[in-house]
Each structure stands twice: as structure tokens, then as C-alpha cells.
Amino acid sequence: MSTHNIESRVIKAPLAKVWAIISALDFAFWSLVKSVESTSGSQIVGSTHTVTFNDGTTQVYRIVEFSEINNSLTYEIIESEPAMGVLSATHRIRAYPVSADNTTFVQWTSDFAAEGSQEAVGDAKYKKLEALAELAKAVEN
């Protein structure tokens, strides 16, 4: 059994500005993130990114897809301390232009493999909602 979660937001900024922040993969817009250490460059498939959160949680993300054409990136969490309570987690962030008003629609999806605890899924949901709100704040000001 797997669990799929989608969170999204329209951000009042052009796609190029939003994608520049997302594709940097430093999560600088997200107040829960203390630091990010990257290997092999941030936009290279196979590169890893050690994300340390303010609460002490450390997760290692591996980039499995990166597309400038589609303004999307996919990463999997390959390590987490403390453990997440799921067998695996894959996340995708994709940005779409909204041509009617030059804004950007951002969609952040997560797929949790079998045995995914509802606590882990719920936690990811609220963290993504908060991160999208903070991304909007970072680019709309």
C-alpha cells in the first residue's frame, strides 16, 4: 500500500523567479531548514543534499529527476535521523506558468511506500503547506 499526497499554491510571481528559487535546492525560503549541504552540484541527477532542520532532524535527499524544460525536480529521501516511519518517500516539485496573470502554480507531491505511517504523511503535508507559503512570501516581496 502506498500513500500519495499533493499540496499546491498559486504564487504571485513569474515562473522564472519562482523556479530560480526552487531549483537552487537550498530551501533558503523555508524557515524550518537550518542548512543544506550539496554534493556534485545542486541540479545534477544523483547528487545528494543533506538537509538539517531547526529541530535537529537530518535528511539526505538524492535527486532522481531534474528538468529545466518542465520546471520540475524529483528527490527521494535516502536517509533520515530520526527515522521517518515509512519505507520510502519520493517528492516532486513542479512549477507551471499561469499565463492569464503571469503568476506561477507550484505543485509539491509526495509518494510514501507501503507501511507509511499516517503521522509521517500528515507531517509532510503540513510542512509542504508551510514551505509553499514561505516560498510565496520570499518571491512576492
Feature locations, PLM:
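Hydrophobic ligand-binding cavity/cleft-lining segments
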Residues: 1-44
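Glycine-rich portal/gate segments that line the openings of hydrophobic small-molecule binding cavities
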Residues: 29-82, 141
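A generic beta-sheet turn/junction motif
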Residues: 11, 54, 99-101
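Short beta-strand segments
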Residues: 5-7, 57-61, 104
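Beta-strand/loop substructures that line and gate deep hydrophobic ligand-binding cavities in soluble
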Residues: 80-130, 141
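Short amphipathic alpha-helical signal-transduction/dimerization elements
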Residues: 26, 129-140
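Hydrophobic/aromatic beta-strand elements that line small-molecule binding cavities or substrate pockets
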Residues: 9, 59-65, 89-98
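Hydrophobic pocket/interface hotspot
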Residues: 18-22, 49, 63, 75, ...
